[in-house]
Amino acid sequence: MLVIIRPSGEIALKSPRSRRNFEYTLINNIRNTIGGGKIWRSQGVILLEVNDNNANIEALSEVFGISSFSPVIAIKSNNLEDIVNKAKEIFAEIVKGKIFAVRAKRIGSHSFTSLDVERRAGEALYPYSKGVDLENPEVEIFIEIRNEMTYFYHKVIKGPKGLPVGVAGKTVVLFSGGIDSPVATWMMMKRGSVPIILNFNLGGDLHKELVLKELNMLKRWSGGHKLKIFIVKGTDVFIKLSQVERRSRVVMLKRVMYKTAEKLCEKTNAKSITTGESLSQVSSQTMANLYVTEYGIKYPIFRPLIGFDKEEIVDIARKIGTYKHSIKLPEYCAISTKARTSEDLNEILKNEERLNVDYEKILENSEVIEL
């Protein structure tokens, strides 16, 4: 089986050197996802050849950096008569009783135009069909002539677009396991980041089990990259926070998470922190509290969901398969029912100094898992 893979449009806009690096990363991610086959670059597309006709090429729809892909039949000929005869052989049964259109595309120098190909192939297929409609066909027939090769297909399967996972470096994700953090992780992967997962386990075995189920769903989108997970025992942090006024505990917990993520960035050479926060969704995510929460953190903090409402986030969670696990997870971060919407920075910093949390020790005592 031969497949034409079309990289995301923005990859083509990169400089030649960057484009080459992005495409090679994409090729590696495709190979890791499919598990084998011959793969190479060719004039702006990627060609994948697999021996097994039952290969799971549908998995390409979950490889970031792919705009679309098509299983194709290829012939080594750019002779117009050969092209028309092959089109008739392949597509006569497919257009039978249906309204169709032929779309042709050429790269290279030929003695005919793309319109010539469309007309001749259309004439050959017309007797088998219900008619031609170039605007609203039931079936589209595609013919691509690339120099001396010609490719025939009738399916264009959408990819997720974005950038290949790995081109943007690593980010530490504060992963609670609720609806938001898996979606934020997915969105950063779509921009080429490899996520390093930091989870504060505040709910015991059930929490851990559901988080791992969510991450197994996200693993499908990773382009074969391993997901490294640091699971912190959250009860120890809770004990520390019991010394803080109840209304300030949510923001203090977030501060502990951010500072631990900062330490993990240092250890893993990650260059950013990612969270699933959305502006004003809850009291700890007001602009004032986000300012307090991230104060003094030296790494950039990415919040891909900052402008999304809950309905939009849920739609993505359903699409990527994490929602069914997320809804089973209680909101463990809601440790105070009377949280302030605007914490006092100086008070928070004094509490932080008094608690004297050992972030290095938190990571040393964490459980590390690779998926």
From Swiss-Prot:
Family of this protein = Belongs to the ThiI family.
- Binding residue positions for ATP: 174-175, 199-200, 254, 276, 285
What is the first-listed, main subcellular location in coarse terms? cytoplasm
Entry keyword ATP-binding = yes
EC nos: 2.8.1.4
Q: Which GO terms describe its biological process?
A: thiamine biosynthetic process; thiamine diphosphate biosynthetic process; thiazole biosynthetic process; tRNA 4-thiouridine biosynthesis
InterPro entries in alphabetical order: Rossmann-like_a/b/a_fold (IPR014729), ThiI_AANH (IPR020536), ThiI_fer (IPR054173), ThiI_N (IPR049961), THUMP_dom (IPR004114), THUMP_ThiI (IPR049962), tRNA_STrfase (IPR003720), tRNA_sulfurtransferase_ThiI (IPR050102)
Please state the pathway this protein functions in, per its UniProt record: Cofactor biosynthesis; thiamine diphosphate biosynthesis
Listed A to Z, the keywords are: ATP-binding, Cytoplasm, Nucleotide-binding, RNA-binding, Thiamine biosynthesis, Transferase, tRNA-binding
Q: What does this protein do?
A: Catalyzes the ATP-dependent transfer of a sulfur to tRNA to produce 4-thiouridine in position 8 of tRNAs, which functions as a near-UV photosensor. Also catalyzes the transfer of sulfur to the sulfur carrier protein ThiS, forming ThiS-thiocarboxylate. This is a step in the synthesis of thiazole, in the thiamine biosynthesis pathway. The sulfur is donated as persulfide by IscS.
Cystine pairings recorded for this chain:
none
Q: Which PANTHER family match?
A: TRNA SULFURTRANSFERASE
KW Ribonucleoprotein (keyword) present: no
Identify this protein by name.
Probable tRNA sulfurtransferase
What is its subcellular localisation? Cytoplasm
Domain THUMP as annotated: residue spans: 54-156
